[in-house]
């Protein structure tokens, strides 16, 4: 009978083909030492798997081969391209494929060339893999991206109309953007939502007469005792008038269904869809959601790289539907053999949130006013509002890129009004040299000085108008330095806003003999600097890709692509006998095939041109999505696997992939599925010395200095 060791050896013969999840989930323990897995598994060649490519036969270089596009239309790469198909090689790994006597200068030059070619190859492969996915087409395909921008412009123009209506009615004069006015701010947000939902004046009156249920109001009560007493008195009066007020949280007290519909017009129910495959289209999802009563709209995100470019979505329904039944129905319905993983989306319970109260200080407010004016002029220009309406998109983009003074050129009536409200030259920027000469480069005071906390109502009034304009028209939450780009498709079409909080407090902030707050100048300067930085990075700055970089990344020429398409469809069969594979017809010469394609298949030639523009749009995006790069594991020696000294043992490596709470991160290493990624397999011997990664990968022979005339018994 065979021994256990013999049986183990026979099983180990096929260890490389087996993927036993349970075996590698068991850690080797401690800071190193062998685990059972380490003893059983021979050396492997592959590093952590790249998420979006399926596992297949391993290439000679130890990296995944190209699988073509997602639909299987791409061909396997040729052998000379195999070095580009995997992750970028480190410099040391790259040198193993070079000559031994290569100079340092040549090595660096060749490595830079390799990096450029690798980048070009990876971008082209990513484009081919995702070009048929809806999110990618909407983002970069010229005709589809144009439609998206047209819809966006329509939404912004409607929001602009609503802003002007509310402004003419004096709605913005009833409050300031301070947290103590949270109730009036909530009423303003509700008014915007009712108008966005095409509600009537009766609907608006019913909504404004409704009792507000928001945690922001409770916070106001806690922060201001006097205001809290007034609110409590109002609540008591309302209780006397409405005896049926005691209801569950979120419930609405109305006498009839008709009144309920009016009150609920600004509220919705929604379902969050966590798992939308990249190939699933908006129309497919929308048709599924329309099967349920009360469906309003659907919002989908772009593909998420960390989740294999799966998307997330929100399906919005009317408030009076049974959202639980709808959620159950969506979970029971599979689309393309995929579960949507729908859950009920929670309502926003705190719609008014606070920024640091120092934002009301005159110096800070003046800085914010300049930023708000710039943002207003910039986003008006981007979307083609006011004087930019007659300009082409390329001309508008050129002006922005060249740094044209958009504030001075703006014809937005609100910008003109702001200029008339604030003192002259308030909005003018000064140069760095002028600031240094005037002694205002650091805020005008020494960093160690303290200044009196001062509010300027004129500046704050102008600032509030601009912030409300940005929030309603452009969906920009100024004090949160965020842009809610998809807000018109989301469940809450004007959901929340950040405002100024209570005046600052802390150990470094005190009061003078008059009871006025005294704030350190350094605190103010640091706050301004940090806020400006976040606004610039989040809302103003845009990275551009130069023409030179686009050429390096493989920019395509539309006419050259057409010529290449014609060449592919021109096949010589014999003398004076040519075939057009596209139509299957035969011609006497290539010039006849060209004429045939230009007359009968002009649409195909246009597709070739459009494909080039499609690809170039992808390259022109500095924030373009790409595949996540797998991590390279360091070469490990034999001693690293043994306990007692190595801090990079196998058990430690797995710990490095864990999330901040100690457990494995849900999407660690860029993996969408919840299984841990396949661990690297290390050699425990052989090849003279410590184990190395990629034992089967080609490598240059070590240089030897052996005397060929020496006897065989002398090494």
From Swiss-Prot:
| Gene Ontology cellular-component terms listed | nuclear body; nucleoplasm
Q: State the function annotated in the UniProt record.
A: Acts as a mediator between the cap-binding complex (CBC) and the primary microRNAs (miRNAs) processing machinery. Contributes to the stability and delivery of capped primary miRNA transcripts to the primary miRNA processing complex, thereby playing a role in RNA-mediated gene silencing (RNAi) by miRNAs.
Q: Per its UniProt entry, which superkingdom is the organism in? A: Eukaryota
Protein name (database record) = Serrate RNA effector molecule homolog
Residues covered by region (Disordered)? 1-87, 223-259, 629-715
Basic and acidic residues bias (residue ranges): 7-25, 37-57, 223-242, 629-659
Protein's cellular compartments: Nucleus
Q: Name one GO biological process term.
A: primary miRNA processing
Q: Does the keyword Nucleus apply?
A: yes
Give start-end positions of Acidic residues composition bias. Answer: 243-256
Alphabetized, the UniProt keywords read: Nucleus, RNA-mediated gene silencing
> Known InterPro entries for this protein?
Nucleotide-bd_a/b_plait_sf, SE/Ars2, SERRATE/Ars2_C, SERRATE/Ars2_N
**Family per UniProt?**
Belongs to the ARS2 family.
């Amino acid at each position: 009978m065979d021994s256990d060791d013999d049986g183990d050896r026979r099983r180990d013969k096929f260890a490389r083909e087996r993927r036993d999840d349970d075996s590698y989930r068991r850690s080797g323990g401690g800071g190193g030492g062998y685990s059972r897995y380490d003893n059983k598994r021979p050396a492997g060649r592959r590093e952590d798997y790249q998420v979006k490519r399926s596992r297949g036969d391993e290439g000679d270089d130890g990296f995944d081969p190209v699988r073509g596009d997602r639909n299987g239309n791409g061909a396997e790469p040729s052998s000379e391209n195999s070095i580009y198909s995997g992750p970028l090689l480190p410099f040391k790994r790259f040198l193993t494929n070079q000559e031994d006597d290569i100079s340092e200068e040549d090595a660096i030059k060749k490595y830079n060339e390799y990096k450029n070619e690798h980048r070009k190859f990876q971008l082209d492969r990513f484009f081919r893999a995702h070009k048929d996915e809806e999110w990618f087409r909407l983002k970069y395909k010229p005709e589809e991206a144009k439609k998206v921008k047209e819809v966006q412009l329509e939404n912004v123009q409607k929001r602009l109309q609503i802003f002007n209506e509310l402004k003419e009615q004096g709605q913005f004069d009833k409050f300031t953007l301070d947290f103590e006015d949270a109730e009036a701010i909530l009423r303003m947000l509700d008014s915007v939502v009712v108008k966005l939902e095409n509600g009537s004046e009766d609907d608006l009156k019913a909504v404004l007469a409704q009792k507000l249920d928001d945690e922001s109001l409770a916070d106001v009560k806690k922060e201001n005792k006097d205001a809290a007493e007034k609110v409590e008195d109002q609540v008591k009066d309302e209780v006397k008038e409405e005896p049926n007020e005691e209801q569950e949280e979120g419930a609405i007290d109305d006498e009839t269904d008709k009144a309920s519909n009016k009150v609920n017009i600004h509220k919705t129910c929604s379902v969050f869809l966590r798992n939308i495959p990249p190939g699933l289209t908006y129309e497919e999802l929308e048709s599924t959601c329309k099967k349920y009563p009360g469906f309003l709209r659907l919002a989908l995100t772009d593909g998420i790289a960390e989740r294999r470019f799966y998307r997330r979505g929100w399906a919005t329904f009317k408030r009076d539907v049974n959202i639980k039944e709808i959620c159950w129905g969506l979970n029971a319905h599979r689309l393309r053999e995929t579960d949507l993983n729908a859950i009920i989306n929670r309502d926003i319970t705190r719609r008014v949130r606070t920024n640091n109260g120092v934002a009301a200080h005159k110096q800070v407010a003046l800085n914010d006013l300049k930023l708000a004016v710039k943002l207003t002029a910039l986003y008006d220009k981007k979307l083609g509002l006011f004087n930019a309406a007659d300009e082409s998109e390329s001309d508008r983009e050129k002006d922005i890129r060249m740094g044209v003074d958009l504030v001075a050129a703006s014809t937005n009536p609100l910008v003109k009004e702001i200029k008339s409200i604030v003192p002259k030259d308030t909005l003018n920027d000064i140069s760095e040299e002028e600031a240094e000469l005037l002694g205002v480069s650091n805020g005008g005071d020494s960093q160690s000085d303290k200044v009196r906390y001062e509010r300027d109502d004129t500046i704050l009034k102008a600032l509030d108008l601009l912030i409300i304009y940005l929030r309603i028209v452009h969906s920009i939450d100024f004090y949160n330095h965020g842009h809610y780009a998809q807000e018109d498709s989301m469940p809450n079409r004007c959901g929340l806003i950040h405002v100024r909080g209570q005046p600052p407090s802390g150990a470094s902030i005190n009061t003078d003999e008059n009871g006025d707050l005294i704030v350190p100048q350094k605190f103010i300067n640091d706050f301004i600097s940090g806020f400006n930085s976040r606004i610039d990075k989040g809302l103003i700055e845009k990275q551009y890709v130069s023409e030179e970089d686009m050429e390096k990344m493989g920019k395509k020429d539309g006419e050259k692509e057409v010529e290449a398409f014609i060449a592919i469809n021109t096949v010589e069969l014999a003398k004076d006998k040519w075939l057009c594979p596209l139509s299957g017809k035969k011609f006497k010469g290539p010039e006849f095939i060209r004429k045939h394609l230009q007359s009968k298949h002009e649409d195909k030639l246009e597709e070739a041109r459009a494909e080039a523009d499609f690809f170039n749009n992808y390259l022109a995006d500095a924030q373009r999505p790409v595949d996540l790069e797998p991590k390279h594991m360091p070469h490990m020696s034999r001693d690293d696997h043994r306990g007692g000294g190595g801090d990079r043992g196998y058990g430690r490596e797995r710990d490095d992939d864990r999330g901040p709470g100690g457990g494995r991160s849900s999407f660690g290493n860029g993996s969408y599925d919840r299984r841990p990624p396949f661990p690297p397999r290390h050699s425990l011997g052989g090849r003279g010395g410590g184990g190395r990664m990629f034992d089967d990968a080609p490598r240059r022979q070590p240089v030897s200095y052996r005397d060929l005339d020496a006897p065989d018994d002398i090494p």
